[in-house]
């Protein structure tokens, strides 16, 4: 019988956050590809575009005018997925629970990260920009909105912060921006994750799990996981870390270059719990991760990035108390700047069993985390920033 080798043989990996298995098929990256490909072109965008509805001072589609902002700018989304309208819920459970409907109320906001149209988070790490000067204000805006929205809107239970970067992820405008959705319910995935965290802490079998403890003195799922990854021989899945946060490829990753950013020194439930030093650490690691992404294939790396944290203070129950702040990066690229991974077929048909096919090997036969770590050994100067690209063309 052939000895099992995870780097070569199909297998399943357990995702303890969602309590599902992920099917890993490392040999699949060797198949020939004649499918769709993304453009690798990097257009030289201007710092200001008079037709952009996110640039400072410009008029949006509704006629509202943007402030002449110089750092971050937040406004309520006029084309929101949710509306702040209170409606009377009706009892629709009259068909054996098969046709249930529940009203969804909320507010949506747009967060412009920077006034310059041609910047990304990744490019804010390279001179004349810096994480201290240009990314910290973004985190301050996130924190302020988390606190302000919950204080001003008692119906809100959960605030989802996220960014879709690049046309491959459905982004309709290249101007650096993210979104905030304030919901009157806790979404399915954050609820599952909170439940998993609570159950891990409450399970007596985990009493001696390593890592920092929850404020109630119990072990914590992600803090224990971060501790074990940081103490694994060679740290094979750790991408980078600083004084407060670690960026790593999750053991159960679905996307080839998926990354999770999480604290490893102490329990942080939400942005409200951060010290200024921790905000600085988060700014630096976000800048580093996104910069390394771009440098990997020398392209503006597309991704969806989202923050999981506690529900708003007035909506916190016993489950919410165990929610740990962490960030997910889901980039679609597979083996180059032009070939992406698609979640189709088997993934959709067996979603209850697996989240996808984890490609543990890249085109050169080494795992994605090793590709990233190899690239991360280089300086974190951004190779596709406007300044660097102009210099390289001279």
Where are these regions (language model features)?
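Active-site microenvironments that recognize anionic phosphate/pyrophosphate groups
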Residues: 1-175, 181-271, 277, 291, ...
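An acidic, glycine-/histidine-flanked metal-binding catalytic module
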Residues: 286-290
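Gly/Ser/Thr-rich active-site loops/lids in small-molecule metabolic enzymes
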Residues: 279-285
